Swiss-Prot record:
Listed GO MF terms: pyridoxine 5'-phosphate synthase activity
Upper classification of the organism: Bacteria, Pseudomonadati, Pseudomonadota, Alphaproteobacteria, Rickettsiales
Catalytically driven reaction(s): 3-amino-2-oxopropyl phosphate + 1-deoxy-D-xylulose 5-phosphate = pyridoxine 5'-phosphate + phosphate + 2 H2O + H(+)
Protein name per its UniProtKB record: Pyridoxine 5'-phosphate synthase
Organism: Anaplasma phagocytophilum (strain HZ)
Superkingdom as given in the UniProt entry: Bacteria
Signal sequence, start to end: none
Site label Transition state stabilizer, positions: 150
Keywords associated with the record: Cytoplasm, Pyridoxine biosynthesis, Transferase
């Protein structure tokens, strides 16, 4: 199983004081040195953490794939086409939310998203949709011809309820049967990672806030190495 490390909240710490530290590139490279297979960043419309220049610095100075999370807007499409990250993950976005609250509703803005997906793929970028573990949304994603699905596993990470893990397991099977690659993300800590890593057909997880918090006491390298050891054991 692969590990994507989201470095958004490294930028959050930096932006709180308007400084140049901590360096998002330095922390990303530490994560890579200790087992991260790719680096994830979410460029929000309000630029509350990662900024445009961070994307280009990461693309230039980090030697693993960049996974750009973004809303399905013309502005973000233009940025993605110029940056040319290896992967783009389309996510829902609300200005008032603290973090992404749910997966995409695939029925909303269907034509707009379909256009953006086709444009990204035309530029050689693999496209992921961030979805709740819903059979209806997975079927819609298949019709949209995306490459991957990232399952929103936040409900399980909060509740640790067996039925939530069963929903994730079933959704991962549906993604696989539809011919798409399945990832998972949102709210994952060490304990959740151990359970999710055992789910068949999930090939990667994205972890951000938890690892940045762990890095404060344990160091980014140690936190990433522990997470990678858990999901590959």
């Amino acid at each position: 199983m692969q590990l994507g490390v989201n470095v958004d909240h490294v930028a959050t710490l930096r932006n709180l004081r308007g400084t140049t530290y901590p360096s998002i590139v330095e922390l990303a490279n530490i994560a890579v040195e200790h087992g991260a297979d790719f680096i994830t960043v979410h460029l929000r419309e309000d630029r509350r953490h990662v900024r445009d220049d961070d994307l280009y610095a990461l693309k230039k100075h980090v030697n693993v794939p960049i996974n750009l999370e973004m809303a399905a807007t013309e502005e973000m499409l233009a940025i993605a086409k110029e940056l040319s990250p290896e992967f783009v993950c389309l996510v829902p976005e609300k200005r008032e939310e603290v973090t992404t609250e749910s997966g995409l509703d695939t029925k909303l803005l269907y034509d707009t998203r379909l256009f953006i997906i086709s444009e990204l793929q035309r530029h050689g970028i693999k496209v992921t949709l961030f979805l709740d573990p819903s059979e209806e949304d997975i079927a819609c994603a298949k019709r949209m011809n995306v490459d991957k699905i990232e399952l929103h596993v936040g409900a399980y990470c909060i509740s640790r309820a067996p039925q939530e893990l069963e929903m994730i397991t079933r959704a991962a099977q549906l993604v696989h049967e539809a011919g798409m690659i399945c990832h998972a993300g949102h709210g994952i800590d060490y304990e959740c990672a151990a359970a999710i890593s055992k789910v068949k057909h999930i090939t990667a997880i994205n972890v951000g806030h938890f690892l940045v918090c762990e890095a404060i006491t344990q160091g980014m390298g140690n936190a990433v190495r522990k997470m990678k050891d858990i999901i590959t054991s």
